[in-house]
Curated annotation (Swiss-Prot):
Expressed in the antennal lobe (at protein level). It comes from the Eukaryota. It is found in: Secreted. GO terms for cellular component: extracellular region. The modification Arginine amide is found at residue 9. The lineage of its organism: Eukaryota, Metazoa, Ecdysozoa, Arthropoda, Hexapoda. Signal peptide: none annotated. This is Tachykinin-related peptide 1. GO terms for biological process: neuropeptide signaling pathway. It comes from Acrosternum hilare.
Amino acid sequence: GPSGFLGMR
């Protein structure tokens, strides 16, 4: 996903 929340995955 985007580097906002699920971006860490």
